[in-house]
């Protein structure tokens, strides 16, 4: 299967550059993957498409202020993106510009040392005074909004590029499928008998890396660490045993669920599950855990688009995206959403 099979024309005007004026006021395109039928609705009406006994799994990660600008000795400005805290990679950054190992950078009155320059635009940094680099970014950094927005982060992004239930800091990109969740919608879902559970998955480096192969089978997927609490494991086991439906909110949640499926389904224990999801989901994959998927409209040739196609069916998804463009839906992180059921 070729990456080019997942290309399509996305008009620039269909990319939402800012969040909607009111959280939860976006549109929702509902796709029935059995019939291919499409229903035009609103994100705020999600509760009308779910039923008692369903389980909604949300990613409660919190986006950190991971973007920072520094100055080289030459006077050139360089953009730095601090990646997720993860064992020995805790001082890894993604950079845009030129860097050399051993050079010093200046930022907000502090000196940063470039310890090592790595492939794919990565480097290992440290504060020259031995301070905590993550604390430094938290104090001086800005919200790492996606580069395709083609603007700097603004005050509105501090609140709106974050979910209302964000709890555990660590992501450099938001779990965008749930950006339009509101307390009111979550309460209606609970009142209707829909169970709400959480997973913590810190969205990291892979969000910014393009596919560099022509064939899907040759692509090596990035890893994302996750923690599924014991109460969420128990809820998933109970719902599956009772014949209920698991609704994954977002592609990262989907990857983590499918990665942990053997441990969830083959065990009666309710212990927490921790892992690193490196699973690459594309058409032909057989889902074990996820029954419904709530997700955004994704960029051409992206791994998240391929995952969505695996869930919806390639022809169904192609037709749905064509309809969405025609009907003026907004795409990508701050845009509208799809429910695949």
Swiss-Prot record:
Major location category of this protein? cytoplasm
A GO term (biological process) for this protein? queuosine biosynthetic process
| InterPro entries cross-referenced by the UniProt entry | QueA, QueA_dom1, QueA_dom2, QueA_sf
User: Which reaction does this chain catalyze?
Assistant: 7-aminomethyl-7-carbaguanosine(34) in tRNA + S-adenosyl-L-methionine = epoxyqueuosine(34) in tRNA + adenine + L-methionine + 2 H(+)
Query: Which domain of life does the UniProt lineage start with?
Result: Bacteria
Q: Name one Pfam family in it.
A: Queuosine_synth
Pathway in which the depicted protein is active = tRNA modification; tRNA-queuosine biosynthesis
User: What are the subcellular locations of this protein?
Assistant: Cytoplasm
Sorted keywords for this record are:
Cytoplasm, Queuosine biosynthesis, S-adenosyl-L-methionine, Transferase
GO molecular-function terms, A-Z? S-adenosylmethionine:tRNA ribosyltransferase-isomerase activity
Write down the EC number.
2.4.99.17
Gene Ontology, cellular component aspect: cytoplasm
Does the keyword section mention Cytoplasm? yes
Q: Does the keyword S-adenosyl-L-methionine apply?
A: yes
Subunit and interaction comment: Monomer.
What does the similarity note say? Belongs to the QueA family.
Q: What does this protein do?
A: Transfers and isomerizes the ribose moiety from AdoMet to the 7-aminomethyl group of 7-deazaguanine (preQ1-tRNA) to give epoxyqueuosine (oQ-tRNA).
Q: What is this protein called?
A: S-adenosylmethionine:tRNA ribosyltransferase-isomerase
């Amino acid at each position: 299967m070729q990456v080019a099979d997942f290309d399509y024309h996305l008009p620039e005007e269909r990319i939402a550059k800012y969040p909607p004026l009111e959280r939860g006021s976006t549109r929702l395109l509902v796709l029935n993957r059995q019939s291919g039928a499409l229903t035009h609705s609103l994100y705020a009406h999600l509760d009308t498409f779910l039923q008692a006994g369903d389980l909604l799994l949300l990613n409660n990660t919190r986006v950190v202020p991971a973007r920072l600008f520094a100055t080289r000795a030459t006077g050139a400005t360089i953009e730095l993106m601090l990646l997720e805290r993860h064992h020995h990679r805790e001082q890894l950054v993604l950079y845009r510009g030129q860097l050399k190992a051993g050079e010093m950078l200046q930022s907000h009155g502090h000196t940063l040392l470039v310890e090592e320059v790595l492939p794919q635009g990565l480097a290992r940094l440290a504060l020259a005074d031995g301070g905590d680099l993550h604390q430094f970014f938290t104090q001086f950094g800005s919200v790492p909004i996606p580069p395709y927005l083609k603007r700097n982060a603004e005050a509105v992004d501090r609140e709106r590029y974050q979910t209302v239930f964000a709890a555990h800091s660590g992501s450099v990109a938001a779990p965008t499928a749930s950006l339009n969740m509101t307390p009111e919608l979550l309460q209606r879902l609970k009142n209707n008998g829909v169970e709400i559970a959480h997973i913590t998955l810190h969205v990291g480096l892979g969000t910014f890396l393009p596919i560099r192969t022509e064939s899907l089978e040759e692509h090596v997927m990035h890893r994302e660490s996750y923690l599924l609490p014991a109460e969420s494991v128990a809820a998933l086991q109970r719902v599956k045993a009772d014949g209920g439906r698991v609704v994954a909110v977002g592609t990262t949640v989907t990857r983590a669920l499918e990665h942990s499926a053997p441990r969830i389904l083959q065990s009666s224990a309710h212990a927490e599950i921790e892992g690193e999801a490196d699973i690459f989901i594309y058409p032909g994959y057989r889902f074990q855990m996820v029954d419904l998927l709530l997700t955004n409209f994704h960029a051409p040739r992206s791994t998240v688009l391929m995952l969505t196609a695996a869930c919806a069916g390639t022809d169904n998804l192609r037709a749905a995206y064509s309809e969405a463009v025609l009907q003026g839906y907004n795409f990508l992180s701050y845009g509208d959403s799809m429910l695949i059921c």
